[in-house]
Amino acid sequence: MEATAASTSLPDPGDFDRNVPRICGVCGDRATGFHFNAMTCEGCKGFFRRSMKRKALFTCPFNGDCRITKDNRRHCQACRLKRCIDIGMMKEFILTDEEVQRKREMILKRKEEEALKDSLRPKLSEEQQRIITTLLEAHHKTYDDTYSDFSQFRPPVRNSEDEGNRPLRSILTPSFSGNSSSSCSDHCTSSPDTMEPTSFSNQDLNEEDSDDPSVTLDLSQLSMLPHLADLVSYSIQKVIGFAKMIPGFRDLTPEDQIVLLKSSAIEVIMLRSNQSFTLDDDMSWTCGSPDYKYQVSDVTRAGHSLELIEPLIKFQVGLKKLNLHEEEHVLLMAICIVSPDRPGVQDAALVEAIQDRLSNTLQTYIRCRHPPPGSHLLYAKMIQKLADLRSLNEEHSKQYRCLSFQPESSMKLTPLLFEVFGNEIS
């Protein structure tokens, strides 16, 4: 009787390629797995079990070395059983009737427990799934990760070599006193805005005046202000586009929409910018080409002090380390925009109802889709980031007022910046 090579012990499951057909070691039929310590088909598995339970004694009618195949395996039970034993099948692996019953009961119990767990596990409702899908689509439509539009801004000018090559950690120090900010605050009081803002709801966002580049180059300490002013104006337009697609946002009055957009714009821009923020040594915002890699020194050249930049970098690092899913990121932006506690909101109840739907969706998503340990206290950490943004918004407002009240810097700003930040609500 011809023998085929077969293992008599349980192999490592990783040794088998799922795409390679497995062959029964007894008859050569397609094997379904390891049964009683050998690779066999269902037919030979059942034959061996029945034979062992009955303690059957078979006699070969021929010379005791019949070749067993799929077609003739029923012809000689003696040689078939001998073949089963030769390839390593063991009766010790056969369960008794009681053991079989216990195993069935355990399997049934496990299935019932899994079904109960599944029924108790939070699931996204159809409405919540629609909210997430809508926000993802809105974000993809309003955030270009190729940053191709940046070439349309006034060009970045980095002509201050003494700061340009300084590493981030030499600029951001725990002992920073913030003198530049305090000195600015000395002469930038909370006097009313001198510029009359245009109508926000009717403004053509694509028509913004640009200043003469020759004037920009004369003020090296503000060399990056024209470029970053255009960048922020561009980002505001994108935030507006995103907000309009938030489910429920268009149900608000135009007045409340404007209030929410004006008060949250810079916060959402800071949230959006986390996508391009890198945790390298220089901790920069990388937006495509080297020309659009923004470091701390670039922000200082736009007139901002470390009183804003230090907490901004800390915020960006903390947010990046949360490793948010894109779904969580867009929900956080929407929650940030639709905040009922913004000063000037008229229908706070409706705004709160919209925000509650978004918040509930975020919490359910985290429980359903964000595996531990990253999900631990994640919602609370995200809400804390919104509180951090309020502080950043307040500091940005102070520093923006300093810029807007100085003729040499205000002339670098855009009409949209004056409209959104020039008539500060918060």
UniProtKB/Swiss-Prot annotation:
InterPro entries: DBD_VDR (IPR042153), NHR-like_dom_sf (IPR035500), Nucl_hrmn_rcpt_lig-bd (IPR000536), Nuclear_hormone_rcpt_NR1 (IPR050234), Nuclear_hrmn_rcpt (IPR001723), VitD_rcpt (IPR000324), Znf_hrmn_rcpt (IPR001628), Znf_NHR/GATA (IPR013088). Ubiquitinated by UBR5, leading to its degradation: UBR5 specifically recognizes and binds ligand-bound VDR when it is not associated with coactivators (NCOAs). In presence of NCOAs, the UBR5-degron is not accessible, preventing its ubiquitination and degradation. Mammary gland, expression increases during lactation. Also found in colon, expression is down-regulated at parturition. Residues 147-215 are annotated as: Disordered. Zn(2+) 1 binds at residues 24, 27, 41, 44. It comes from the Eukaryota. Belongs to the nuclear hormone receptor family. NR1 subfamily. Nuclear receptor for calcitriol, the active form of vitamin D3 which mediates the action of this vitamin on cells. Enters the nucleus upon vitamin D3 binding where it forms heterodimers with the retinoid X receptor/RXR. The VDR-RXR heterodimers bind to specific response elements on DNA and activate the transcription of vitamin D3-responsive target genes. Plays a central role in calcium homeostasis. Also functions as a receptor for the secondary bile acid lithocholic acid (LCA) and its metabolites. Composed of three domains: a modulating N-terminal domain, a DNA-binding domain and a C-terminal ligand-binding domain. This is Vitamin D3 receptor. It comes from Bos taurus (Bovine). The gene is VDR.
